[in-house]
A protein has these predicted regions:
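Conserved N-proximal alpha/beta basic substrate-recognition cap immediately N-terminal to
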Residues: 4-124, 140
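Active-site nucleotide/adenylate-binding loops and adjacent lid/helix of ATP-dependent enzymes
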Residues: 83-201
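Short acidic-glycine loop/turn motifs at beta-strand connectors
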Residues: 150, 198-202, 233-235, 295-298
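A long amphipathic alpha-helix within ATP-dependent nucleotide-binding catalytic cores
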Residues: 174-175, 179-185, 211-295
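Beta-strand scaffold of nucleotide-dependent catalytic cores
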Residues: 184, 190-197, 203-211, 219-221, ...
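A short, polar/charged loop-to-alpha-helix boundary motif
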Residues: 217-220, 310-320
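A short beta-strand motif that forms the metal-chelation/ATP-contact edge
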Residues: 292, 298-312
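Residue-level detector of conserved catalytic or cofactor/ligand-binding positions
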Residues: 320-327
Length: 327
């Protein structure tokens, strides 16, 4: 009954302006009649639990029913999370201040609580730093993240006033990057999303994707203009073109020109090991997406997501989670 209620909320919460935009995108991509697309989207919502964004970004408009049925859609993903994750532990991940305390040993960089910090603690935190990252405590998709430069503030106290006014109270030193990660897009901290599933005490890696910034932006999230691609779990090599939230496809990074497919990411085994270790910390939360940076000396977790989106591994240029072929 809870899942039926969730589906009903999804259907009744449709934002028709955004839905119309997705219908336009489908028409531009394949020429499909817009009325047909509208009703096909409704059918996919009922049959597969797919929202209009799922329909467009997964390429449902160009698939058979059997192929559509291999995808982890919005409603199905919610069901997975409900089965594998105890909601009593939501704040361990959704509250970034709490997460930074709970998983401190995996972060490998100093953090500070801007809500409680004194000017003296802020001054000590900023010592030797050119810039820091400041985030809102409950945010997603890269929203509410700023890179603050020390030179732009008269004093540590002035920066503290600013972050409290803007509610950017999750403070972190800028994570240094391995050269092979930085060269993809030097202005952003580029991260792997490593999704782990804890089943019967064993950690399994479901997928790995790579998120990269673009256009000089400091955020690698596709919701903030970044791009993403699939990574081979065994080799750590990029195994798909990149795409963005506007369904553009890139064989090379659009800014640095680096060819993507076949690019070897560094320290993949160390990154997988760290994700698997972190996955055991809260066994009541078995399905987690870990955003992992690779520093010069090893991996570091940026954050954990207890409701990891399915778009990161199933966008149209990628393979579905279950490969299926038909005669």
């Amino acid at each position: 009954m809870a899942m039926i209620g969730y589906v009903a909320r999804v259907l009744t919460g449709v934002r028709f302006k955004k839905m119309n935009h997705m219908i336009d995108v489908v028409h531009q991509k394949c020429g499909q009649n817009k009325v047909r697309t509208f009703f096909d989207m409704l059918w996919c919502a009922v049959r597969y639990g797919a929202g209009y964004y799922d329909y467009t970004m997964f390429g449902f408009y160009d698939m058979t029913g059997a192929q559509r049925d291999t995808y982890l859609t919005r409603v199905r993903n919610k069901k997975v999370s409900n089965i594998m994750n105890d909601m009593a532990h939501d704040d361990d991940f959704d509250d970034k201040l709490l997460f930074n305390v709970r998983f401190a040993k995996y972060l490998r960089r100093p953090t500070l609580n801007g809500e409680t910090a004194t000017p003296e603690q802020m001054a000590q935190f900023l010592e030797g730093q050119e810039a820091i990252f400041a985030k809102i405590n409950h945010g997603s998709c890269g929203n509410g993240v700023e890179k603050l430069y020390v030179k732009d503030f008269e004093s540590p106290a002035a920066m503290l006033d600013y972050i409290r006014e803007k509610k950017l109270v999750v403070l972190e030193h800028v994570q240094a990057q391995h050269p092979d990660m930085a060269r993809l897009h030097p202005q952003s901290v580029n991260t792997m999303r490593i999704c782990t599933d804890l089943v019967d005490g064993q950690v399994h890696i479901a997928y790995i994707t790579l998120k990269m910034g673009r256009g000089g932006g400091v955020c690698d999230n596709s919701g903030q203009g970044g791009i993403l691609c699939r990574v081979d779990i065994d080799t750590g090599k990029i195994c798909s073109p990149a795409t963005d939230d506007y369904f553009n496809v890139f064989d090379k990074h659009p800014d640095t020109g680096i060819p993507l497919v076949g690019y070897q990411l560094p320290m993949i085994e160390e990154a997988k090991a760290l994700a698997c270790q972190a996955a055991l910390e809260i066994p009541e939360v078995g399905h987690v997406g870990w955003d992992m940076a690779i520093g010069p000396d090893g991996p570091a977790i940026i954050e954990g997501n207890d409701f990891p989106g399915t778009d990161l591994c199933q966008l149209a240029p990628f393979l579905s989670l279950i490969h299926i072929s038909e005669p």
